[in-house]
Amino acid sequence: MEKLIKLVGFWLCATIIILGLMGCDRLIGNSGDVVERVSDGDTIVVKDANGKNITVRFACVDAPEIAHTNKEKQSKISSDRNQFTWGVKAQERVQELVQQGGDRVTLNITDSDRYGRKVAEVRLKNGTFIQQVLLQEGLAKAYRPYLNKCPSKDLIQQAEAQAKNQKLGIWSDTKFVNPWEYRALYKK
């Protein structure tokens, strides 16, 4: 009888441990929100825990614009082509990072914008801060009007300074127009 009790106890403990580990794997392995698509260099759409799609604008940074309309895609205007070329590079880099992170991100939502998008610091499961990478590689600029709402303000400024000093990405392009200036001048 004692042998039977030990055997049942062993299997009961083993079952509890296995079920517990399966639950932990689900929580750890699939943590974060699923990225449905990368809209551009500073905007993604994620599916939250309830299955709802949420548009997320990256906090603290502004990436170059991408062409949205056929007219923009066919534009021969040099400022358009320049902006859109850098915009596509930023978008592709975000797509690459998201794929490396298993199509999941962790959001630190800091605000909502006038378009109803959530504004957030976006990190991969391994902790990689996407905005920091974009800035370090010269694929975005710090968006100064909103830096005070940015919990990682110091990291943002350091990453941008690093790219600027090394003349990486947009910092190497003397014809590049800041995204906010481009929108004000050309997107009316």
Q: For each of these PLM feature ranges, what is it?
A:
Residues 2-12:
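Bacterial N-terminal signal peptides that target proteins for export
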Residues 13-19:
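Sec-dependent N-terminal signal peptides
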Residues 22-23:
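C-terminal motif of bacterial Sec signal peptides marking the signal peptidase cleavage site
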Residues 26-139, 143:
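Electropositive
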Residues 148-188:
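N-terminal targeting pre-sequences for secretion and organelle import
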